[in-house]
Amino acid sequence: MRINLTTSDPEVSIREKKNLGRIAQIIGPVLDVAFPPGKMPNIYNALVVKGRDTLGQEINVTCEVQQLLGNNRVRAVAMSATEGLKRGMDVVDMGNPLSVPVGGATLGRIFNVLGEPVDNLGPVDTRTTSPIHKSAPAFIQLDTKLSIFETGIKVVDLLAPYRRGGKIGLFGGAGVGKTVLIMELINNIAKAHGGVSVFGGVGERTREGNDLYMEMKESGVINEQNLAESKVALVYGQMNEPPGARMRVGLTALTMAEYFRDVNEQDVLLFIDNIFRFVQAGSEVSALLGRMPSAVGYQPTLSTEMGTLQERITSTKKGSITSIQAVYVPADDLTDPAPATTFAHLDATTVLSRGLAAKGIYPAVDPLDSTSTMLQPRIVGEEHYETAQQVKQTLQRYKELQDIIAILGLDELSEEDRLTVARARKIERFLSQPFFVAEVFTGSPGKYVGLAETIRGFKLILSGEFDSLPEQAFYLVGNIDEATAKATNLEMESKLKK
């Protein structure tokens, strides 16, 4: 894949090109611009409006060409607010699509859709930039080998493993631990895979973006003293931004991730929160451009827009981009065109459960609702597959028995069912795990558990080897050896109390 890197200064290119047009019409965030005959900009070219408003304040608005209308006019969508613009203002054709800074200089910083830093930490090195519109990697460049992306999180690796270079949907309401799970994944990919992460905040609340940034600084994911040692770059296009910015901010984040994959040859985690807002912004832009709406009022190009973004997220022979996308489901309707189109691209789903969070089991990943296309014997191996299936069967049986237990109590169950319940409760607790990024809040050190250790632990619980241990010993530990050590400590404590 050709990385089209430019090292030009935008001001120099303005002076060189001087392809000037004038604003002919403004409708909200959409501008019609007239250019001289034979000087029409290309689709997706960046246009810059510079001037002063009626109060003498400087205006600097970047737009993206979306349509060529004829009569030497183009229609462009603004990437920032259009207040203060008026007809007749000069518009400069930059001659290229939007380009954003890429590489190590982006780590630890917050950018907007244009690749401008918005964290008041000074300018960013823009000698290496890359256009946000690119083709997906060619078929011959793809790495077609199916391999698991080990996260070090037991419940994910065992029951709904992530595919290296795959796409994962993250489902969960407010307050069930999405942010902490995201931060732990960012931390683990940096430590175990030497990789980096890019976080794309697409159309979500500014407060949430700010909270995430503060928590990342607190947990060490962003290193304030030495930004180069940070593990993540942040790109935000929040709810208050115009639809053009919300529609393109995902591509800005993806472009930064592609550089780490293709040039630095690293494994990259790309977070998109929220993929539904990307579709929603596309729908708004589509209506503003006058396109005929499709089903439920969505844009007619919904599948194309989603495919263009998702096909660039993949493994190549150099590195991989594994994407975790938070999915908002409007009115809990999974048949809505936005989530339905997203599902077609997902390799795995991680569903967070409020019930588990209420029990204090973190990460609150629902072991029965979360799925993965990777959980097949030919991919993960017979041992992993069998262990995962047995764990699910045990938990499913426990779920079925809960009504009986609530009405009649445990004593009314058969001996076999009582054993199943005891093991299921141990499994449920063993699926919890202390996180590195939560150390500052909980005081207990984080644990990274390798896949082989995870499988060994659950096999031993299922075999009945630890039927005599108290279930509390399995709560918030790393591997199975820590659980046995905790059981010994609990036994000693109870003896001392006596």
UniProtKB/Swiss-Prot annotation:
Modified-residue entries (Phosphoserine), positions: S13
Membrane topology type: Peripheral membrane protein
One Gene Ontology term of the molecular function aspect: ATP hydrolysis activity
SUPFAM superfamilies given in the database record: C-terminal domain of alpha and beta subunits of F1 ATP synthase (SSF47917), N-terminal domain of alpha and beta subunits of F1 ATP synthase (SSF50615), P-loop containing nucleoside triphosphate hydrolases (SSF52540)
Keyword flag Nucleotidyltransferase: no
GO BP, one annotated term: proton motive force-driven mitochondrial ATP synthesis
Gene3D superfamilies with a match to the protein in the record: 2.40.10.170, Bovine Mitochondrial F1-atpase, Atp Synthase Beta Chain, Chain D, domain 3 (1.10.1140.10), P-loop containing nucleotide triphosphate hydrolases (3.40.50.300)
Keywords for this protein: ATP synthesis, ATP-binding, CF(1), Chloroplast, Hydrogen ion transport, Ion transport, Membrane, Nucleotide-binding, Phosphoprotein, Plastid, Thylakoid, Translocase, Transport
Catalysis: reaction(s): ATP + H2O + 4 H(+)(in) = ADP + phosphate + 5 H(+)(out)
E.C. no: 7.1.2.2
Pfam family of the protein (one): ATP-synt_ab
UniProt enzyme class: translocase
Residues the record lists as binding ATP: G172, G173, A174, G175, V176, G177, K178, T179
Modified residues (Phosphothreonine): T6
GO CC term (a single one): mitochondrion
Localization: Plastid, Chloroplast thylakoid membrane
UniProt similarity note: Belongs to the ATPase alpha/beta chains family.
HAMAP family linked to this entry: ATP_synth_beta_bact
Function comment: Produces ATP from ADP in the presence of a proton gradient across the membrane. The catalytic sites are hosted primarily by the beta subunits.
Protein name per Swiss-Prot or TrEMBL: ATP synthase subunit beta, chloroplastic
Originating species: Barbarea verna (Land cress)
